[in-house]
Each structure stands twice: as C-alpha cells, then as structure tokens.
C-alpha cells in the first residue's frame, strides 16, 4: 500500500514538472497606433484571456498602418520571432486579404474590430467585432427626435466598419426630417477643424473616430468648441466623463474587453488544435445618452465592459 502511494506521488510530481514546462503559445498582435488609449480595454481582455490560455502576447509597436504594405512588414518581422499565430486589425485596402493569406502562411490569424470587403463567393477570415451597422442605427435613433442637419467625421480610412456605421445611421434617419449634409473622412495629419470650415453649418456632428470625438469633447469642455452637438463612438473613460458633463450628447461604446478576450481564446484554441475551425463573433456595445445618463448607475455598466 505504501509503495503504491509513493508511486502515485512520484507520478503526480513528474506530471506537475512537465505541466509547468509546457511552452507558452506566442501570439503577435498588430494594431494601428498600438499605444493609443482606445485599445486599453481590448488589451486588458487579451491579457486576461492569455493568462487563462497559457499564451504570451507580443503587441507590435506601431504608428498608423495606412495600407497592406506596412502591415506586411510587421507580419514578416514577427514570423522571424517564431510566432505561433496572429491577431490583426486589418489595414485598409483591397489587397489586404490576399496579403494576409500569403504572408501568414501556415500561421493562423484572426481579424478583430474591422472586417474586410469580400467578393461574392469568397470566404472571409473569421472576425470578432461589434455590429457596426447597428451602432450607426442606434446613433441615428438618438438624432432623429428633431429635424436637423448632420455632419459626419469618420476615420481617415474608409473601412468596412465605417461604411456599415454610416449605412445604419442613414437607415435610422429615413423619414425623420433630419438629413446628412456632409461626411469628412479624416486624412493623416489633417486639421479637422479647418477642414470643417469648407462645409455647411451642421446642427449635430456624428464622429465615428474615437480619437477625434474625445478631442472635440475636450475642446468643448474648455470652451474652445461651441459648434454642433456631438455624438459618436468612443472607448475611453474620459469620453464617458465628457458625456456626463454635457460636452457629448450621445455615445456608443463597443465592448473592447470582450473583443480582446475572445480573440485570444479563439486563436489559442486554433494553435493548440490544428483542425479547429475558428469562429467569428458579434460583440456587445453600450449606448449612453446625456439626457438620461447617470454617473452612479451607468458608469458601473461602462466599467464592467472596460475592465
């Protein structure tokens, strides 16, 4: 009996030794402007999932990624570092999908936060992202309560996500008397305020670029912006605070934490089990309106998805 117990203990300790020495899965994460605070919740979700899935994340240090050529260089660099798989925010451009398939090769990759345009009959890469059309529609529902002229400021690249948001916004405004007067697509190093002077006066701005929304909200907070009411998509706690102060009137917050968590879980599963078919997911988002916002009640709801 004692010999049997000693044998079982020996087996247990050997198992623990080998279990602790299992190599971590190495996952490269490629995001545009990777140090930007809009990725905070997403990266928090990734870190939590990585800890649960024995994965090590390498977040590439990037600036703006304005096309597939730039993204290709980051992929090649990480392949030289013996990466097992990639999580990628796809660069704008019709050639991105083909580039990813070619460059990633046998390394699995998963797209996040923005899908790629796919021709009829082709199969898209799995993507984890919110329903951008529905986000646009919900913003439109906040705006259609009164007749007004609306201006749109979108990300500097005309992504599939932005197109879907604008489509949803347009659908929601149909028959309301409100209309979209103009749309500006941000360009690199462009002064948006100066660019807006070329357009007709708007009663409300829908800002689909989180960085620009926060910038305009901060200007309103300090009395430097006194134009149209601000609505848009944001990720940061600062943006929610600006809503609470009345500098922003309507806000949609995608659940970046969920995107990050599920993306690592899926890619880790694929790396461990070669024949596993990765799934795409439609993730959650929060909707806030200044007129019924409560910092006590709604902040907790935001923080739940943020952290």
Model regions: which residues?
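Hydrophobic membrane-insertion alpha-helices, especially the h-region
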Residues: 1-14
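Venus flytrap/periplasmic-binding-protein-like
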Residues: 114-120, 210-211, 222-251, 288-292
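Hydrophobic alpha-helical
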Residues: 86-105, 169, 185-240
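Short beta-strand segments enriched in small/hydrophobic residues
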Residues: 17-42, 59, 126, 149-158
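Short, solvent-exposed amphipathic alpha-helices that sit
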Residues: 38-53, 135-139, 160-179, 215
């Amino acid at each position: 009996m004692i010999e049997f117990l000693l044998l079982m203990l020996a087996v247990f300790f050997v198992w623990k030794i080998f279990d602790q020495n299992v190599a971590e899965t190495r996952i490269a994460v490629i995001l545009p402007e990777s140090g930007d605070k809009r990725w905070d919740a997403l990266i928090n979700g990734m870190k939590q999932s990585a800890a649960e899935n024995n994965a090590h994340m390498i977040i590439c240090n990037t600036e703006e990624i304005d096309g597939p050529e730039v993204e290709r260089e980051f992929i090649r660099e990480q392949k030289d570092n013996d990466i097992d798989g990639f999580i990628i925010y796809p660069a704008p451009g019709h050639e991105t999908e083909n580039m990813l398939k070619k460059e990633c090769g046998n390394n699995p990759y998963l797209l996040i936060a923005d899908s790629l345009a796919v021709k009829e009959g082709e199969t898209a890469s799995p993507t984890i992202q919110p329903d951008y059309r529905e986000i646009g529609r919900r913003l439109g529902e906040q705006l259609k309560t009164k007749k007004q002229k609306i201006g749109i400021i979108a990300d500097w690249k005309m992504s599939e996500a932005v197109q879907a948001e604008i489509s949803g916004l347009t659908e929601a405004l149909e028959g309301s008397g409100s209309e979209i007067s103009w749309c500006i697509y941000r360009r690199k190093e462009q002064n948006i305020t100066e660019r807006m002077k070329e357009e007709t006066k708007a009663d409300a701005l829908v800002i689909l670029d989180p960085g620009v929304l926060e910038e305009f909200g901060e200007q309103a907070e300090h009395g430097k912006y006194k134009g149209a009411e601000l609505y848009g998509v944001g990720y940061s706690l600062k943006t929610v605070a600006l809503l609470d102060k009345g500098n922003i009137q309507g806000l949609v917050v995608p659940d970046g934490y969920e995107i990050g968590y599920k993306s690592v879980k899926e890619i880790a599963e694929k790396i461990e089990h070669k024949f596993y078919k990765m799934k795409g997911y439609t993730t959650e988002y929060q909707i806030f309106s200044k007129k019924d916002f409560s910092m006590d009640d709604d902040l907790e709801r935001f923080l739940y998805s943020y952290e």
